[in-house]
């Protein structure tokens, strides 16, 4: 059974009042999370930190933020108390508020997080998902609140774009999750967690949450460069995957300026169908997309592009489609992830039969491409691929019952 914790409903009134006061103060103070080294130097200079100290202070702060995972200046014991007070008076470390935490029966976590407004209107809510696996743990990170792409099979696409997330908000999803899972030195893991104590919990990041990362290029770039910085979070760029639906002009730039692994939401082998499934194809058709993929910087057998392909019954799952997919990807070092369609209320598609998915995969495998079938994770908490949607647009009870009915047979076989 999935476990759900609604944090905002269980807090006492005094805590709510205190949190509101803190949030009001945070709206007025600059966050240091998400700043580059040089930007942090400038921020410290602006409050009067002596010039000869700024680089040292930045190194200290970087270590506390990204190696130790602290969320309070008071925890930074190697910084003098007067300096800590100066930092507290001028800056913030504003971790998001947990609105709801859900834990799937398969161990997947989904968090609904609320970020303060910070001058951007009302507070916004986004969803972040953690997927534990054998020898690894993957965090699925959002880049936007909502999405503009309206892919017809994707639940997230039914939520209109509210705004882009900042580099701070993208990074804070990772910092929050590592703290929550006890993944920083000296941090306790949750009482209800079954996660191993012996290894790093979050080994991989995938930019596959809410939104199109390449429509928020600068913030995503900044966040991922900080996440991969060797003096901080130190995630290998080989373990960070940026997923795009095909924003062709930014693909080459992403390879040159960010240098992480690339995934492409493909889902169709001809323009006429992809125009329906992934409407951005009308602007950047398959010929343009494939050309950009062939020219992706660093592309090699060791740095393959992952192509995501959702399996839709009687839509894109024929063996002829599989053969056309092989032809389409010819010459591109690639892996093809086959994704069983995850149902959601109001969707008009069905998942391909399992036997058909296996036959499809076999055709691709025989052509020399790896084509793993992605086992659905977190379906019972709407954390599976294509299911994310912030709870500012929560499911009505009738919709949730409909979803449970739709998924009943599938869940029993996983």
Curated annotation (Swiss-Prot):
[4Fe-4S] cluster binds at residues 147, 151, 154. InterPro entries: Aldolase_TIM, Methyltransferase_A, RlmN_N, RNA_MTrfase_RlmN, rRNA_lsu_MTrfase_RlmN/Cfr, rSAM. The keyword Ribonucleoprotein does not apply. Disulfide bonds join 140-385. Pfam families: Radical_SAM, RlmN_N. One of its GO terms (biological process) is rRNA base methylation. It comes from the Bacteria. It is found in: Cytoplasm. GO terms for cellular component: cytoplasm. Its EC number is 2.1.1.192. Reaction proceeds by a ping-pong mechanism involving intermediate methylation of a conserved cysteine residue. Specifically methylates position 2 of adenine 2503 in 23S rRNA and position 2 of adenine 37 in tRNAs. m2A2503 modification seems to play a crucial role in the proofreading step occurring at the peptidyl transferase center and thus would serve to optimize ribosomal fidelity. Belongs to the radical SAM superfamily. RlmN family. This is Dual-specificity RNA methyltransferase RlmN. It comes from Bartonella bacilliformis (strain ATCC 35685 / KC583 / Herrer 020/F12,63). The gene is rlmN.
């Amino acid at each position: 059974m999935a476990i759900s914790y609604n944090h905002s409903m269980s807090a006492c009134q005094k805590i709510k009042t205190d949190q509101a006061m803190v949030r009001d103060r945070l709206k007025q103070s600059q966050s240091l999370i998400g700043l580059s080294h040089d930007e942090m130097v400038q921020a410290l200079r602006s409050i009067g930190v002596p010039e000869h100290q700024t680089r040292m202070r930045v190194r200290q702060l970087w270590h506390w933020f990204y190696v130790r995972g602290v969320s309070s200046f008071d925890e930074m014991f190697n910084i003098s108390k007067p300096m800590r007070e100066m930092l507290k008076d001028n800056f913030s470390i504003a971790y998001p508020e947990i609105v709801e935490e859900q834990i799937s029966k398969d161990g997947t976590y989904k968090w609904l997080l609320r970020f303060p407004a910070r001058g951007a209107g009302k507070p916004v809510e986004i969803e972040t998902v953690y997927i534990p696996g054998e020898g690894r743990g993957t965090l699925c990170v959002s880049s936007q609140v909502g999405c503009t792409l309206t892919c017809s099979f994707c639940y997230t696409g039914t939520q209109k774009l509210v705004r882009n997330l900042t580099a701070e908000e993208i990074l804070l999803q990772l910092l929050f999750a590592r703290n929550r899972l006890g993944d920083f030195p000296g941090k306790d893991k949750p009482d209800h967690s079954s996660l191993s104590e012996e290894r790093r919990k979050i080994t991989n990041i995938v930019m596959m949450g809410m939104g199109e990362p390449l429509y928020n290029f600068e913030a995503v770039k900044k966040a991922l460069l900080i996440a991969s910085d060797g003096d901080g979070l130190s995630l290998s760029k080989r373990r960070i995957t940026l997923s795009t639906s095909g924003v062709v002009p930014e693909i080459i730039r992403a390879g040159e300026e960010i240098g992480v692994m690339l995934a492409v939401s493909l889902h169709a082998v001809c323009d006429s169908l992809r125009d329906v499934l992934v409407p951005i194809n009308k602007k950047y058709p398959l010929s343009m997309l494939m050309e950009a993929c062939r020219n992706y910087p660093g592309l090699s057998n060791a740095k393959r592009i992952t192509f995501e392909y959702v399996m839709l019954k009687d839509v894109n799952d024929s063996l002829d489609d599989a053969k056309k997919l092989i032809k389409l990807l010819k010459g591109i070092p690639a892996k093809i992830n086959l994704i069983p369609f995850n149902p959601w209320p109001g969707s008009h598609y069905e998942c391909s039969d399992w036997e058909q998915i296996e036959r499809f995969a076999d055709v691709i495998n025989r052509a020399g491409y790896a084509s793993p079938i992605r086992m659905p994770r977190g379906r019972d908490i709407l954390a599976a691929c294509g299911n994310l949607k912030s709870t500012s647009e929560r499911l009505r009870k009738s919709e949730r019952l409909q979803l449970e009915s739709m998924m009943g047979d599938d869940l029993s076989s996983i």
